[in-house]
C-alpha cells in the first residue's frame, strides 16, 4: 500500500508541470518588493484576507504571503515580499520572466468584512484600519473591496520611518481618510498607529469596528487600546506556517481559551480574545530545533515538521 509520502510525491510531480511566472516586479522600499504572479486559479477564486504559500524552487522553503491584490481578467495575484531569511532572499533575486515553483492558494478564510452576505451590516459600520509596516499589504485589498462595494473606511498606516513607507498613493485612492504616522516623526504623525487612533478619538471621531494588521506586538497594543475604547477589533494573525492546511501545527494559537490554527480557522480573529503573549512566545520557540522539540513534547499530537512530507523539515 502507498503511504502519505507517495501522495505528496504524486502531487509534487503534478504541480511541477505548472510554473507561476513573475509578470511584474517592483521595488517598494529597501528589502521590500511587489510581484504580480500569473496564477489563474488563485486569481479566479481569491478574496481579501486570504493568503498563498509560495516556493521559489523544488528545495525552497514554503513561504506564506498575504494576497495584496488580484486581477481576475489578467489572471494575476499581487504579493509583497520582505527579505527576512534565505527563502525570501531567493525570491527577491528572481526577476520578471522567472517563475515560482509553487503558488498554492487561496488559503485561509476571507475577511468577514469583505463578504457580500455581510455587506448590509458592514455598510452600517464606521470602520478604521490600522496597518503596521508590511501589514499595509493585506489591508489594501480589504479597503479597496469595501470602496468598490460602497463602504467608506478610514486607514492609519504606521511605519518606523519614511524610508520604508509604501502604498501611500494606492491607499489614498481607496480610503475615506488616510493617516500616515512614523515612529521617528520623519513623516506624518509622530507616533505609532495606536497613538494616532487615540488622537483621532480624542478629536471626536467614533468607530464601530477596528481592523489591525501588522507585527504581533503592534496588534497586541492596538487591542489593549481598542478594548479600553470599547471598539470591536479584528486582527489578522501571522504566526509561522508550513503547510497551510492545519496539518503541521506551526500556526497554533489560543483564542478565547481554545486552540485555533491561523491557516484554517483564520487568519482573522477577534483581537480581544487572542492570547498574544502565548503567540509571541511560541513564535520565538518555533525558530529553533530545540524549541520545536519542546513544543512537540508539550502539545503531543500536534505535528511540528520533520516528517518529510509537509516541508517542515526543509
Predicted regions and their residues:
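Short, small-residue-biased leader/transition segments that mark boundaries at the very start
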Residues: 1-8
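Ferredoxin-reductase
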Residues: 15-98
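Short, Lys/Arg- and Gly-enriched loop/turn segments at beta-strand edges
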Residues: 60-67, 107-117, 263
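Local cysteine-cluster metal-coordination motifs and their immediate loop/turn environment
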Residues: 138, 216, 238-268, 302-313
